Amino acid sequence: KGKLYSGENLISEICEDGYYNLAVWNKLFKRSIFDKIRFPDNRYEDAFIFFEILERVSKVYISQETKYFYRQRKDSIMNKVFDDNVLDNITYRELFLETAHKRYQRLIPLMSFNCKMGYFFVLGILAKSKDIKNKFELARELQRKMREGIKEVIKSDKVNFNGKIAYTSLAVSFKLYQYLFELNKFIKKLSGKQNILYP
């Protein structure tokens, strides 16, 4: 039901096992961990302190059991239409890649892939918003970075078939992605099936 991580490879092993969900709401911490760690001001993501926390602990236990529940309010920042704070999702991923280059070389491929998924996540939000015309240069830059990772994503076993279609379509054409997104909503409405597109 769970796994205990410890030792000098703690961070690498946790990340390689896929347990790098970076939100703090699904974790329990010793209070003393935050004696010297503070969340950065005006940041959208909790994730900026992820490596800092793991570098200060000697053991991490990851459980599959449900311990408590997270309630997402309608006015939660996670539900807002695109705003510039969402770009922090990319900033922390690129920071992690930079950290991997400096201290965790074995995590470079994983963090590089993580960056591509960050571009996908943010551009997916932007492509579905009314702001895409006002932020066209940003959209094009994210699209360029996504195209660099198409082969990486297609070969990955971390992305399902529908996710690969969504990623590739967004990397190639905003209109194609938007069309597939609307088609997905239509199919879901008719069949009641889950979304085929991410995000």
Regions found by a protein language model. Give the residues of each.
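Conserved nucleotide-sugar donor-binding catalytic segment
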Residues: G2-D83
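Active-site catalytic microenvironments for nucleophilic, acid-base chemistry
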Residues: K36, R56, T99, F113, ...
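Catalytic core of nucleotide-sugar-dependent glycosyltransferases
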Residues: K67-R73, N79-L107, F121-K151
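All-alpha amphipathic helical-bundle segments outside canonical DNA-binding/catalytic cores
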Residues: R106-N114
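Membrane-interface aromatic/basic loop that binds lipid-linked glycans or pyrophosphate carriers
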Residues: K128-P199
